[in-house]
């Protein structure tokens, strides 16, 4: 059986680290593409040379040509400018709209049956741009957001509790930004509702920290943004697709009437498998949660309007 093929567009920190995670899991052969000559080639070769040490079998190449991405099963788009301190994800929209549209169009031409996953920011709007530019069905274009946001929330909970992160489960909704909606009502520690274990003020402090999780990393790094957790998050999605795992994960998916919204991308729980987003799950929300979700959706709508697509 032929190996699966994963193309990663953008060989910066997120793209290269995603390639590393994918290789270590032996998910398939990997193409790392970037417009900067030499960068993807060098990183691809460096990663390939790690394979005898770590014992993973896959072929990795770096390239500047979309022709090398032909017949990919999954295309991950990380290309675009990154945030600097004081910038929001939304500040990137004008530049990254052009970049993501170009990447999605070229990738779709080479791999018309592929699934496209967006990591570029502002994520929900860029996922919308990629779907329009590629012309793909909406179930085959979606974004990495909720997995990362939930991972941050779970990390802070485990740190507060002093427990294993493996025992923390949660879900969240909304855009990948300051208006995201972590859901303590769907958060459990070893199967126990979080509100039975922690006071409300501590829970809300962690909710706020999760919303600002990306900005916290940017403030520390000063010259870039997070890449270990974002790349691990997108490769969890790639694995679910290539192995047809039917995982229930929060991703930036297209809403077609679910939750009362139409024609936008935002993070909701979905079933992720070989066909991409195979089902969108509508969960019950309190009045306050619905209000917060509506605010988040409005923010996404405003960004989509700016793209002009």
From Swiss-Prot:
SUPFAM superfamilies found in the cross-reference section: LDH C-terminal domain-like (SSF56327), NAD(P)-binding Rossmann-fold domains (SSF51735)
Keyword Oxidoreductase: yes
Claim: Signal is one of the keywords in the record: no
Record keywords, A-Z: NAD, Oxidoreductase, Tricarboxylic acid cycle
Family membership noted in the UniProt record: Belongs to the LDH/MDH superfamily. MDH type 3 family.
Described function: Catalyzes the reversible oxidation of malate to oxaloacetate.
Molecular function GO terms recorded: L-lactate dehydrogenase activity; L-malate dehydrogenase (NAD+) activity
InterPro entries: L-lactate/malate_DH, Lactate/malate_DH_C, Lactate/malate_DH_N, Lactate_DH/Glyco_Ohase_4_C, Malate_DH_type3, NAD(P)-bd_dom_sf
Organism: Heliobacterium modesticaldum (strain ATCC 51547 / Ice1)
Broad EC category: oxidoreductase
Protein name, as recorded: Malate dehydrogenase
Gene3D superfamilies (UniProt xref): Lactate dehydrogenase/glycoside hydrolase, family 4, C-terminal, NAD(P)-binding Rossmann-like Domain
Cited CDD domains: LDH-like_MDH (cd01339)
Upper classification of the organism: Bacteria, Bacillati, Bacillota, Clostridia, Eubacteriales
Record's catalysed reaction(s): (S)-malate + NAD(+) = oxaloacetate + NADH + H(+)
Residue numbers binding NAD(+): 10-15, 34, 96, 119-121
Active site: 176
Pfam families: Ldh_1_C, Ldh_1_N
């Amino acid at each position: 059986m032929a190996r699966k093929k994963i193309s990663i567009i953008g060989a910066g920190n997120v793209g290269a680290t995603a390639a590393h995670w994918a290789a270590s899991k032996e998910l398939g052969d990997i193409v790392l593409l970037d417009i900067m000559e030499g960068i993807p080639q060098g990183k691809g070769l460096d990663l390939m040379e790690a394979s005898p040490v770590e014992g993973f079998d896959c072929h990795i190449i770096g390239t500047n040509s979309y022709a090398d991405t032909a017949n990919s099963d999954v295309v991950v788009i990380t290309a675009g400018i990154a945030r600097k301190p004081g910038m929001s994800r939304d500040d990137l929209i004008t530049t990254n709209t052009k970049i993501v549209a170009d990447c999605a169009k070229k990738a779709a031409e080479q791999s018309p049956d592929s699934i496209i996953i967006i990591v570029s920011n502002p994520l929900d709007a860029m996922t919308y741009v990629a779907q329009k530019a590629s012309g793909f069905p909406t179930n085959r274009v979606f974004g990495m957001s909720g997995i990362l946001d939930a991972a941050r929330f779970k990390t802070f909970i485990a740190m507060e509790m002093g427990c294993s992160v493996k025992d923390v489960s949660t879900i969240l909704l909304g855009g990948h930004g300051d208006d995201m909606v972590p859901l303590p009502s769907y958060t459990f520690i070893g199967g126990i509702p979080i509100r039975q274990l922690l006071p409300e003020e501590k829970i809300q402090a962690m909710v706020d920290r999760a919303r600002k999780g990306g900005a916290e990393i940017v403030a520390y790094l000063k010259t870039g943004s997070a890449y270990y957790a974002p790349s691990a998050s997108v490769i969890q999605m790639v694995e679910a697709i290539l192995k047809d795992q039917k995982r229930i994960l929060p991703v930036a998916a297209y809403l077609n009437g679910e939750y009362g919204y139409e024609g936008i991308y935002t993070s909701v729980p979905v079933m992720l498998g070989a066909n991409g987003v195979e089902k969108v799950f509508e969960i019950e929300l309190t009045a306050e949660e619905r209000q917060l979700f509506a605010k988040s959706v409005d923010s996404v709508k405003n960004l989509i309007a700016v793209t002009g697509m």
